[in-house]
Design a protein with these regions (language model features):
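RNA substrate-binding interface of SAM-dependent RNA methyltransferases
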Residues: 71-168
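N-terminal positively charged helical leader segments and presequences
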Residues: 1-69
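Active-site/ligand-binding-proximal alpha/beta "capping" segment
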Residues: 167-205, 215-217
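Mobile, glycine- and charge-enriched loop segments
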Residues: 38, 63, 69-81, 185, ...
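Structured adenosyl-cofactor binding patch, chiefly the S-adenosyl-L-methionine
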Residues: 203-245
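Short, ordered loop/turn segments at secondary-structure junctions
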Residues: 9, 67, 110-112, 221
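Generic structural signal for residues in well-ordered beta-strands
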Residues: 38, 62, 145-149, 216
Length: 245
């Protein structure tokens, strides 16, 4: 059954007009028809079973028939601090990290980041990244959308870590010898993952993270790309502490 995101509140027996993006996708791609069943979600953790009530040239009216709790969220909260990379790579990270169950994504500008964004472009990229996450939720069956925060400079990370000081914080870096097999056996708190850009974090950045009690970690003997490393460690964490086991 097709799933669509709706940005407003949803109630039983309510008749709503699908959002512009969802409506266009339903009409032009999915080719939905009157009386077709749909599933809607708005980020509140519920799924709303619905039915197409009527179709106009550019809009689809949908009636909400039932409401069910969606229990497929990960039992662990993973916060991804991802150095900003090129458009395609960043989109891939956000899409796959959403599918894998992350809770928040914090884009960061590190000293070796090759991507520089103006304020206007940053706003546009943030809206785009949020739409990528929504599309990934539609595909993967999630009903809660990960929070994608506004990009920050690396110097601002210490403030973020301070608010998460009771969490397990991991820094992926190819020059470290700590392996994922050395992670705590049992853990149920928040987990923060720090991923550098192409070329990795600088020595000063690694030192700063170490001073904030972050654990430096290496994933095997091969060097992973900035878009590959987060997906590998998220999968490991979901297997070890989450719902992949």
């Amino acid at each position: 059954m097709h799933r669509f995101y709706h940005s407003n509140s949803l109630d039983l027996n309510q008749i709503i007009i699908l959002d512009e993006f969802a409506g266009h996708h339903a009409l032009r791609v999915m080719r939905v028809k009157v009386n077709d069943p749909l599933i809607l979600f708005n980020g509140d953790g519920f799924e709303y079973k619905a039915q197409v009530n009527s179709i106009n040239k550019k809009t689809i009216n949908v009636e909400i028939l039932s409401k069910e709790q969606n229990d497929n969220e990960s039992p662990i909260r993973i916060n991804l601090f991802q150095s900003i990379s090129s458009n395609e790579k960043m989109d891939m990270v956000i899409q796959k990290a959403t599918e894998l169950g992350v809770s928040t994504i914090q884009p960061i500008f590190s000293s070796r980041s090759t991507i520089k964004l103006s304020l206007d472009r940053t706003k546009k990229r943030l809206l785009h990244w949020r739409q990528v996450a929504i599309s990934a939720c539609e595909q993967s069956g999630r009903s809660k959308i990960p929070i994608i925060k506004s990009p920050i400079l690396f110097d601002q990370i210490a403030e973020e870590i301070e608010s998460l000081k009771d969490s397990l914080s991991l820094v992926l870096h190819p020059d470290n010898h700590q392996q994922s097999s050395n992670l705590p056996k049992d853990y149920s708190g928040d987990i923060n993952i720090f991923i550098g850009p192409e070329g990795g974090f600088s020595k000063d950045e690694v030192l700063l993270l170490k001073q904030e009690n972050c654990i430096n970690m290496q994933l095997g003997p091969r060097i992973l790309r900035t878009e590959t490393a987060p997906l590998a460690i998220i999968a490991i964490l979901q297997y070890k502490y989450g719902d992949f086991a």
